[in-house]
């Protein structure tokens, strides 16, 4: 089932690199969804978690991972842990060589994600923190990449400031009556911002 999903994403042009393809095949999505949705784990759709959170659709996880240009040794910050699935895919995309720090504002979700990640052997590569992701995670900054998995009203300056020079942030932003996914690259004290596509995420809390 995972292979069919990955083949479909590759055919649709969402999956472009062998690195992200292997990452998606390596992470068992069914282990990160609620029990009642296990049979739907390899459908390309978001699925409900709890506390008004969702696990992102596989095509969106793939797209965001591709946009940060993953490579071994990277330091990645994820804002919005959810069930831990996206963080696990990022860890595989950097071949578990590097670090993924993930921040979740809902304590119950942070605990749930940490349990999932530990059970599947990601402890030591992925670290989960319960805190306000809009402020980033200054302790381990600067980062090669930041992935935000909830829609912000605007691009938080605290997150931009925690990017390395040349670092990439992928973030959905509320615009008008919709949301736009942006790829933001830090260049010294300035940023380059490129709109990627229209998206639909839960709001950043």
Swiss-Prot record:
It is found in: Cytoplasm. One of its GO terms (cellular component) is cytoplasm. One of its GO terms (biological process) is protein repair. NCBIfam families: pimt (TIGR00080), PRK00312.1 (NF001453). CDD domains: AdoMet_MTases. Belongs to the methyltransferase superfamily. L-isoaspartyl/D-aspartyl protein methyltransferase family. It holds the Pfam family PCMT. One of its GO terms (molecular function) is protein-L-isoaspartate (D-aspartate) O-methyltransferase activity. InterPro entries: PCMT (IPR000682), SAM-dependent_MTases_sf (IPR029063). Disulfide bonds: none annotated. The active site is at 56. It comes from the Archaea. PANTHER family: PROTEIN-L-ISOASPARTATE O-METHYLTRANSFERASE, PROTEIN-L-ISOASPARTATE(D-ASPARTATE) O-METHYLTRANSFERASE. The keyword Cytoplasm applies. Its EC number is 2.1.1.77. This is Protein-L-isoaspartate O-methyltransferase. Catalyzes the methyl esterification of L-isoaspartyl residues in peptides and proteins that result from spontaneous decomposition of normal L-aspartyl and L-asparaginyl residues. It plays a role in the repair and/or degradation of damaged proteins. Its main location: cytoplasm. Keywords: Cytoplasm, Methyltransferase, S-adenosyl-L-methionine, Transferase. It catalyses: [protein]-L-isoaspartate + S-adenosyl-L-methionine = [protein]-L-isoaspartate alpha-methyl ester + S-adenosyl-L-homocysteine.
């Amino acid at each position: 089932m995972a292979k069919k999903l990955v083949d479909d994403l590759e055919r649709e042009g969402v999956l472009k690199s062998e690195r992200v393809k292997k990452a998606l095949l390596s992470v068992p999505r069914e282990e990160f969804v609620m029990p009642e949705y296990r049979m739907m784990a390899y459908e390309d759709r978001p699925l409900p978690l709890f506390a008004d959170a969702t696990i992102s659709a596989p095509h969106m996880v793939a797209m965001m991972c591709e946009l940060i240009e993953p490579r071994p040794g990277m330091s990645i910050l994820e804002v919005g842990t959810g069930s831990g699935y996206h963080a696990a895919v990022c860890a595989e995309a950097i071949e578990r060589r590097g670090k993924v720090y993930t921040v979740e504002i809902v304590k119950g979700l942070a605990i749930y994600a940490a349990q999932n990640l530990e059970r599947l052997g990601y402890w030591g590569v992925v670290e989960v923190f319960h805190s306000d992701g809009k402020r980033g995670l200054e302790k381990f900054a600067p980062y090669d990449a930041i992935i935000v998995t909830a829609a912000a009203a605007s691009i938080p300056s605290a997150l931009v400031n925690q990017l390395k020079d040349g670092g990439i942030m992928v973030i959905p932003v509320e615009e008008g009556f919709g949301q736009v996914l942006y790829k933001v690259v830090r260049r010294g004290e300035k940023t380059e911002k490129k709109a990627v596509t229209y998206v639909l995420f839960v709001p950043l809390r």
